[in-house]
Swiss-Prot record:
The chain crosses the membrane at residues 18-38, 134-154, 160-180, 193-213, 244-264, 272-292. Gene3D superfamilies: Multidrug efflux transporter AcrB transmembrane domain. The gene is secF. Belongs to the SecD/SecF family. SecF subfamily. It is found in: Cell inner membrane. Forms a complex with SecD. Part of the essential Sec protein translocation apparatus which comprises SecA, SecYEG and auxiliary proteins SecDF. Other proteins may also be involved. The keyword Lyase does not apply. This is Protein translocase subunit SecF. One of its GO terms (cellular component) is plasma membrane. Signal peptide: none annotated. It comes from Rhodothermus marinus (strain ATCC 43812 / DSM 4252 / R-10) (Rhodothermus obamensis). GO terms for molecular function: protein-transporting ATPase activity.
Amino acid sequence: MRIFENANYPFVQHRKKAYVFSGVLILLSLVSLVTRGLELGIDFKGGMEFIISGAREPGATAIREALTPVLGTEPEVKTYGAEDILIRVAAEGDINEVQRRIVETIRQRFPETQPEVVQTNIVGPRFAEDLKRGAIYSILGALLVIFVYILIRFEWRFSLGAVVALFHDVLITLGLFSLLHGWLPFSLEIDQTIIAAFLTIVGYSLNDTVVVFDRIREYMNIFKTKPFEEVVNLSINTTLSRTIITSGTTLLVVVILFIFGGEVLRGFSFALIVGIVIGTYSSIFVASPVVIELRARAAARRRLATAR
């Protein structure tokens, strides 16, 4: 992209504005997570899952409204594959009885349908707790491995900058899931596919950040007399074309998945869309500026020690 071929944008000079912007997003995310929380899927709170054929025509919304009074709780209803629907119910009890009520209700309310249960699954509370714990450990473990990897490849300030950026990305994405749940026409429940999306976001954001860090390290050896802030700004600008092209093409694919992938993948693709946008932003305005602040503080301490 020629518009970024000789880019010389003052990203570093505007980092304080970026701090304010990120701070507002993080504050909103924390407030929403504390007050509204997250809507957990049956993977993490237990329940039943049914894949039903021959009942797609009425639509997910109509089926959900018909089943809610019968089941005593609002089920999650999504289109599944080419012809089936997926029904998830956060309920305990006899799965055969719940299945019977679902099938009978659909037949009575929508006579034109011929519902047949293709597959059933049940997630017990203990197994759901194990899955929840495993999801938390997987994200924290990924962050720890990333910290050690960058520590070995660069230095601890770069490691901290990368991990801060990743926490920033995951927290804001989680906050949006909490804030927007119930306001969007698709489910934003946290299940195993969403955890996979978060791990993908972590990897994608890290990739952008490492590219910038690698260029910073290269330019630190070439421009030894330049102030570190100028080196960082030059590094961000020279990798900007690659960052925008990679993010733009990936985002295009994920948007297509969001539009045409069906309701089952809508929450997953929404998480990726948010993560790619926030991750691209953080690789420019969060990760590298954190390194600048840490090095500036270290230099200030050295000057203070020398003055004494």
